[in-house]
Regions:
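Beta-sandwich/jelly-roll carbohydrate-recognition scaffolds of carbohydrate-active enzymes
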Residues: 1-168
Length: 168
């Protein structure tokens, strides 16, 4: 029927926009020493490994096949020297969206713990349609949540820490 056809493909909100700073120095991709990337289609994972500014970073982006429209980034950091690493996440919103709202909330989990969730919403099609994206950090050993948008890792030489960032 009329109106059921796809008229165009709309770019969505990207909930995983990680940036990194080592000892207060924002990461610059041009400073990356040998980089290795691989894609494992069977496990739905894209892996990147690089070294920069005294740390080695391995991150894996996974499609969560049992959860449509969800993905996860797993990050492992190993220190080549004593270092403090700050990761921040910012949602990327396409320019054609209107009424963009960004907010953070703390939500309760079944086990009684609480997690901070970053949420971004916007409208398109002259306000008739809406889209929402959300993300949250899941800290592993050696990782500390600073805010809903940031985590900090403080490592001694040879130390290792990890976290995951889940988004939908």
């Amino acid at each position: 029927g009329f109106g059921d056809d796809v008229s165009r493909i709309l770019e969505g909100i990207n909930p995983l926009g990680l940036t990194m700073a080592v000892d207060g120095h924002r990461f610059d991709p041009s400073e990356v020493r040998p980089q290795h990337q691989s894609v494992d289609m069977r496990r739905a994972v894209h892996t990147t490994r690089f070294s920069t500014d005294g740390v080695t970073v391995v991150y894996r982006i996974r499609a969560l096949r049992n959860m449509p429209y969800a993905l996860m980034t797993e990050v492992e950091v190993t220190a080549e020297r004593d270092a403090e690493v700050l990761f921040s996440n910012g949602h990327t919103v396409p320019g054609e969206f209107a009424d963009t709202l960004r907010e953070s909330r703390t939500v309760g989990c079944e086990d009684g713990s609480r997690i901070a969730v970053q949420r971004t919403s916007g409208s398109y099609n002259r306000g008739r349609d809406h889209i929402v994206a959300s993300s949250t950090f899941l800290c592993g050993e050696g990782c500390e949540a600073v805010s809903p948008e940031s985590v900090r890792i403080v490592l001694r030489k040879g130390g290792r820490a990890s976290f995951s960032l889940v988004g939908t």
